[in-house]
């Protein structure tokens, strides 16, 4: 059995002017995905992929670094304007949004799309510290 040739997928440069930034900020991590208007992923990053481990992933600074990384990737595809959809209760929401604006994007709208249960699943027990 011979060695199989490893195929390298080249990322084709799309030329998309506007898109949607999905910022999902949980208690443990912050993920940012930039998609086009149809929802196809163009670039993504998270605090974990930026090298933060453990409790440092949930910090606002980690979210800011992830937002700077994803904005650099999206600007390579020619993106200039963004709609931002923020979800989750985490601490990285505002800092990720500020980092996207500081990267040079024109933010046209900011929506909070956090899901709220109509008394669905039983929540976790209260922490007693």
Curated annotation (Swiss-Prot):
Keyword Ribonucleoprotein attributed: yes
Keywords annotated in UniProt: Ribonucleoprotein, Ribosomal protein, RNA-binding, rRNA-binding
Cellular component terms (Gene Ontology): ribonucleoprotein complex; ribosome
Record has RNA-binding as a keyword: yes
GO BP annotations listed: translation
Pfam families according to UniProt: Ribosomal_S11
GO molecular function, one term: structural constituent of ribosome
Top-level taxon of the source organism: Bacteria
Cysteine pairings via disulfide bonds: none
NCBIfam families the record matches: PRK05309.1, uS11_bact
Family from the record: Belongs to the universal ribosomal protein uS11 family.
PANTHER family, per the entry: 40S RIBOSOMAL PROTEIN S14/30S RIBOSOMAL PROTEIN S11
Quaternary structure and partners: Part of the 30S ribosomal subunit. Interacts with proteins S7 and S18. Binds to IF-3.
Task performed by this protein: Located on the platform of the 30S subunit, it bridges several disparate RNA helices of the 16S rRNA. Forms part of the Shine-Dalgarno cleft in the 70S ribosome.
Protein name (Swiss-Prot/TrEMBL): Small ribosomal subunit protein uS11
Native species: Rhodopseudomonas palustris (strain BisB18)
């Amino acid at each position: 059995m011979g060695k199989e040739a490893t195929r390298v997928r080249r990322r084709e440069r799309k030329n998309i002017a506007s898109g949607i930034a999905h910022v999902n900020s949980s208690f443990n991590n912050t993920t940012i995905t930039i998609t086009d208007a149809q929802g196809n992923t163009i670039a993504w990053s998270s605090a974990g992929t930026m090298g933060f481990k453990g409790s440092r992933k949930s910090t606002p600074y980690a979210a800011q670094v992830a937002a700077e990384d994803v904005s650099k990737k999206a600007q390579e595809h020619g993106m200039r304007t963004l709609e931002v959809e923020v979800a989750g209760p985490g601490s990285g929401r505002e800092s990720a949004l500020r980092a996207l604006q500081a990267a040079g994007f024109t933010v046209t709208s900011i929506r909070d799309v956090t899901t709220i249960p109509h008394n669905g699943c039983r929540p976790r027990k209260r922490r007693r510290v």
